[in-house]
């Protein structure tokens, strides 16, 4: 049930992989897609920290053999806790063990919890291990803390809790060419509409091994209203149109704003680029 793939999830994955290897079994990470919140509250703001592809890459790198995706639809939402364990986990998937957090609930109406999973699982040969929260000096490590940090533009905290920089991905598409006209051609990403949007502003980061000065926001200098992600890759030449670009966000340099003139804008972009190189 690993949506954010952060330090707590990595701790769970490490334990699962260790148990699986000791038992000579494959280690599988599991996740629901879409997030159950999306099913029960479809109008809630999007908050996904990782895409399915990102999760798969991260857990494979950690040593998992595969990722299991439960499609959270009406059928799964109406599956009783007993059927989830017996019919799905044991009979259909043949699992011999599961590891969850102590706050894990499942089944129709959240009818199952870790006690139900442990007792009913044991009766059907499924060993359930429950792990407590992972904490640091700021409290329990959770996806909510990471979201709050990103919404505040606090990349350092997000990076520490994720154990990696927060990443946005998107296909490079044609934009207004304003950056090119100013001498700073940008890769304009079509962002995942379901992903969390960090605080608008100018960021330092990296893409394709190049330092990046990136703008996330609505481009107020040009009177924009739609969210954009524009990345200037330092010392890069080439055509990225149609490519999928992965952009790491290292630091929020400043808020986005409009300028009195194009000259002022160019001067600020140059300063942002210099800061991104530091």
Q: Could you say what each language-model-derived stretch is?
A:
Residues 54, 157-164, 264-275:
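A non-catalytic, amphipathic alpha-helix used as a structural packing/dimerization or gating element
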Residues 6, 59, 98, 158, ...:
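Residue-level signal for inorganic ion chemistry
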Residues 36-42, 140-141, 257-258:
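A short acidic, helix-capping loop that chelates divalent metal ions and anchors anionic groups
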Residues 118-218:
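Glycine-rich, Lys/Arg-enriched anion-binding loops that position phosphate/diphosphate groups
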